[in-house]
Amino acid sequence: MKSASNKLLPALFCLLLVARLQAAEEPKLSPLPAPVSNNAVAISHDQGRARIFSFMGIGPKKTWDAITTSAYEMDPGTGKWTEKRPVPGVAGRLAASAVALHDQVFIFGGYVVDAQSGETTVSDLNVFVPVENRYYRGQDIPVPVDDAVVGLYRDRYIFLIGGWSTSKDDAVSNVQVYDTDKDTWMQATPIPGTPVFGHAGAIIGDTIVYVDGAYKNPSGPNPKYVASSECWMGKIPKKGDITKIEWTKLPAHPGNARYRIAAGAGPLGKKADRIYFSGGTDIPYNYDGIGYNGQPAEPSPVTFAFNDYTGKWETVSEDTPEPTMDHRGLLVTRRGLIVVGGMEKGQQVTAKVTVIKPVSRK
């Protein structure tokens, strides 16, 4: 008579074989065709097919003329990138935001830089139609912003939260809501905390969460901007007027206050819905990675999450391999958390596509 352990061996072998086959079936995600940082990223699941997009950003020189209009699309099924038609405009942009919805990608704002290092926030809303490789213009953003937080609600409304606006010469508290069905804008309840730019966050269910960012130094011009440690949660009404947001201050998240963290929302396997945050730096800086205080910014290795079910912070990793900063988003997929491009240690612009496998612990 066979022992219980012997009976289990075939089943264990089958499980291991299936796991190995699944791993073998998933191709490695190729680096971007060119190194880029501060690029707007999005993921589409139209018709059950995942597609990853990267728009604009800055190249390795980190100068005004290294800002690009380039656009790329990846099929995770092959792990390969395809170059797409460049984003319209006379110049590339930094600090834009992107959201994919159905068969389109909406690209909001950002700023352009001239040869004298002058920066101008743009009001552009460009909508990319991947299957046709074309763009069309949506209704301009009422208050132009860059370095804002963006989130999708009910597969229809896109929230643009805070950010910097050169028209105001400051960060703004506006929460602007774009109706993708009607191509119209609404103004929602402003953020009650310090207006910030370079903050990070997303929407999960009817919950907005954003953290950190930078703001003008109230003590003077040295440094010009300092990091914010504020964390906020906004509740969007399930019924009635979606612009009436109820804001609540959250306790501090794991790790230091940071700037330009990669953030994104979604379920991961059987885990409850979470908003994930990874990388970023505790030194606010301009587009070259050198802090407003004159010190070089370096990426944080901390990855953490907000659990929408418990309403609590979770530490995912205090030592994320090859951490990066200078991000405009993070993509939550069945593979893990995908980070596209960014700046590595030493302010080096990278083409890498990194997959972070989270194992949450409190």
Language-model features: where?
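Bacterial N-terminal signal peptides that target proteins for export
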Residues: 1-11
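Bacterial N-terminal signal peptides
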Residues: 10-20
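Kelch-like beta-propeller repeat domains
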Residues: 23-362
